[in-house]
């Protein structure tokens, strides 16, 4: 997973761009976590729990996007896709679904979080 951090110094805003197929990870980091040190600490605690209990699923539910860690796999998914019932969707929505969920290895995810902290000087 490739990513880039962008700082708008005039507006004091921070942006995350992730490689194709991982856009939702950037949206999650930017919208759900942002610059909040408490939320970043919460993500780090979840990662620690995942390393301590890799056979369990660890979840951080956000307002629109959630994070799940199971073993060495990280899944970031829009909450709208987490419904327990299946809805028949037309094929033109498949591309949208692909942008609404992404997975990566836990090591890549840890690198993303550490570099985000460094970028924000937290």
Swiss-Prot record:
It holds the Pfam family UPF0231. It comes from the Bacteria. Coiled coil: none annotated. HAMAP family: UPF0231. Belongs to the UPF0231 family. This is UPF0231 protein VIBHAR_03438. It comes from Vibrio campbellii (strain ATCC BAA-1116).
């Amino acid at each position: 997973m490739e990513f880039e951090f962008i700082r708008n110094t005039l507006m004091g805003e921070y942006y995350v761009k992730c490689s194709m197929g991982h856009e939702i990870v950037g949206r999650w980091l930017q919208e759900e976590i942002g610059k909040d040190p408490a939320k970043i600490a919460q993500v780090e605690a979840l990662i620690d729990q995942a390393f301590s209990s890799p056979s369990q699923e660890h979840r951080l539910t956000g307002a629109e996007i959630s994070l799940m860690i199971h073993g060495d796999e990280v899944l970031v998914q829009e909450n709208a896709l987490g419904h327990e019932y299946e809805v028949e969707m037309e094929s033109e929505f498949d591309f949208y679904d692909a942008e609404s969920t992404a997975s990566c290895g836990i090591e890549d995810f840890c690198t993303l979080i550490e570099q985000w902290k460094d970028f924000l000087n937290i």
